[in-house]
């Protein structure tokens, strides 16, 4: 079952097509990877899917009906879509714990609704932070974490969200091997929960390990798609 579709999707910058007439279907509950050389349009595509930038031509639709071209970009989160960025984005002046709680409570962490369900949310936050090894740092400000820890916290926030479609832009970049294992485990857990994950990644070993389906892009166009082992046997992708 397709959960996200693009049809003739196009985005131009200074007259050049960064994404060029792209039509894809993403299957629900699967891990789909987007691969290709630098400058091939991968991040631009993620930005379009997440509503970060305006579509020039074509449409993005969710479950075959909700067309992104007909709603405001800031509304995309209401349609069950969330994402991470190449540059980590957290609430820097909040604690590690509050960075999770603010997601669990949909930003109501400081009001009476949070107090009513405080123990439930704290237990859930502890579970998430223990998965990434940051429970002991729960009272530390996010800004004081190392880069790898900050990236783990950003990924962990995804676990706490109610989103159904998760867009991950190079989630393994700059991580030590032990952290890569943690993030891989989180991505697999998201799939087990029935979430749809769309992943940009350059490491082909990780692509083979995690992906159910692969899209190959270059110059904004779709060059190939299919199961990872079949696609990667036929192509050399940077």
Region annotations inferred by a language model:
Residues 166-170:
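Catalytic Walker B motif of ABC-type/P-loop ATPase nucleotide-binding domains
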Residues 207-209:
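A short, surface-exposed alpha-helical micro-motif characterized by mixed small hydrophobic
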Residues 35-37:
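The feature captures the beta-strand-to-loop junction immediately N-terminal to the Walker
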Residues 59-78, 118:
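ABC ATPase NBD Q-loop/coupling interface
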Residues 50:
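Helix-to-loop junction immediately C-terminal to a conserved catalytic motif
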């Amino acid at each position: 079952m397709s959960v996200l579709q693009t049809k003739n999707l196009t985005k131009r910058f200074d007259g050049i097509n960064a994404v060029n007439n792209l039509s894809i279907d993403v299957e629900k509950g699967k891990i789909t990877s987007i691969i290709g050389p630098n400058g091939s349009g991968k991040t631009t595509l993620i930005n379009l899917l997440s509503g970060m930038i305006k579509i020039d031509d074509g449409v993005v639709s969710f479950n075959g009906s909700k067309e992104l071209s007909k709603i405001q970009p800031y509304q995309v989160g209401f349609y069950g879509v969330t994402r991470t960025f190449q540059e980590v984005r957290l609430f820097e002046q909040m604690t590690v714990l509050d960075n999770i709680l603010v997601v669990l409570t949909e930003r109501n962490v400081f009001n009476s609704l949070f107090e009513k369900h405080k123990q439930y949310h704290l237990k859930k936050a502890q579970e998430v932070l223990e998965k990434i090894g940051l429970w002991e740092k729960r009272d530390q400000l996010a800004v004081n974490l190392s880069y790898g820890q900050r990236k783990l916290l950003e990924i962990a926030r995804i676990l706490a969200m109610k989103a159904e479609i998760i867009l991950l832009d190079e989630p393994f970049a700059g991580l030590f091997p032990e952290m890569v294992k943690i993030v891989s485990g989180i991505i697999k857990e998201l799939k087990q929960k029935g979430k749809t994950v769309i992943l940009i990644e350059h490491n082909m070993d990780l692509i083979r390990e995690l992906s159910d389906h692969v899209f190959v892009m270059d110059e904004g166009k779709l060059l190939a798609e299919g199961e990872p082992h079949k696609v990667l046997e036929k192509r050399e992708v940077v």
